[in-house]
Design a protein with these regions (language model features):
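Conserved alpha-helical "signature site"
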Residues: 1-155, 162-169, 175-177, 183, ...
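Terminal helices and disordered tails flanking the catalytic cores of nucleotide-processing hydrolases
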Residues: 5-14, 254-279
Length: 279
């Protein structure tokens, strides 16, 4: 059996028998989500929770002052940042910003893969956000939120983490980029669903992880469409031959201004603005 097939077999066996070690949501993200679900929470109390993690606090200030939110006046305190982002939106944004803590490894090759995966995920997220912001400009009442899409895009390949962690245990055999890419392509979605369920994430996030690589579309635009668009833009969509058909449909639905949408000035500006949240 090749090392490639051996890794897939090992992962599938562990997944079937609930033996695969799943990543846990960072503690600060758990605290923020619990606080956000408290009906009596207020902006000041939420800021106090976020302040428990200085790195996250700095991230939230950066988000609040990012070009993507389009505010010229800078905020200087967490209270101001939470107020600007919004109490409801903070739950998803804070969780999204805390996820980077999971992309670590003691093995240099695996760490390189995790760092690359995180960079790719941010790129996908920024493109998806850019397209949704464009779509919202002509569809004011669409029930889709940028904070939800941000988190959905950042976890759409979260199933890759246990694959990389497993490879870390057998670096001489599995820490080869080609093997890892094949395993991530074939198993990331299935593992990702299990992870998101274990974290108590809503079905809306699970659906994106399950469906982004598929072809199912509908007249009702959803978060999956924007993650899929971003994957197409990054040449990461697995069904390349179906891309023209999907792009024509998304063009007709108004998700993008033209087929080569990343060359559109507004999309390009939205993308650059979104990147300021992660720089």
């Amino acid at each position: 059996m090749s090392a490639d097939n051996a890794l897939l077999t090992l992962l599938m066996e562990k997944l079937r028998n609930n033996l695969l070690v799943l990543p846990t949501l960072p503690e600060i993200a758990v605290r923020v989500r619990q606080a956000a679900d408290d009906p009596d929470i207020n902006l000041h109390s939420m800021a106090e929770v976020i302040a428990l993690d200085p790195a996250l606090a700095a991230r939230m200030l950066k988000v609040a002052n990012s070009a993507f939110l389009g505010r010229s006046i800078k905020v200087n305190t967490l209270n101001q940042a939470v107020t600007r982002i919004g109490l409801f939106q903070v739950k998803n944004i804070a969780t999204a910003m805390a996820l980077e803590q999971l992309f670590v490894s003691q093995h240099p090759q695996v760490l390189e893969q995790m760092s690359e995966l995180w960079r790719e995920t941010i790129e996908t997220t920024c493109i998806a956000m850019a397209c949704l912001k464009f779509y919202q400009q002509s569809h004011k009442h669409v029930p889709l939120n940028l904070d939800t899409l941000t988190l959905a895009a950042l976890v759409y390949q979260i199933g890759a983490l246990p694959i990389l962690t497993e490879a870390e245990k057998y670096p001489a055999v599995f820490a080869e980029p080609t093997y890892l890419r094949h395993a991530i392509r074939d198993l990331s979605a299935s593992i990702g669903v299990v992870i998101l369920q274990s974290w108590g994430f809503a079905d809306i996030f699970i659906k994106v992880t399950q469906d982004w690589a598929g072809l199912q579309t509908s007249d009702e635009v959803c978060y999956t469409d924007f993650v899929r668009l971003a994957a197409i833009a990054r040449q990461q969509f697995p069904r390349r031959s179906n891309e023209p058909q999907l792009l024509e449909q998304y063009l007709a639905q108004g998700l993008i201004p033209k087929v080569n949408f990343m060359q559109d000035p507004q999309i390009a500006q939205n993308y650059q603005d979104a990147k300021t949240m992660f720089m």
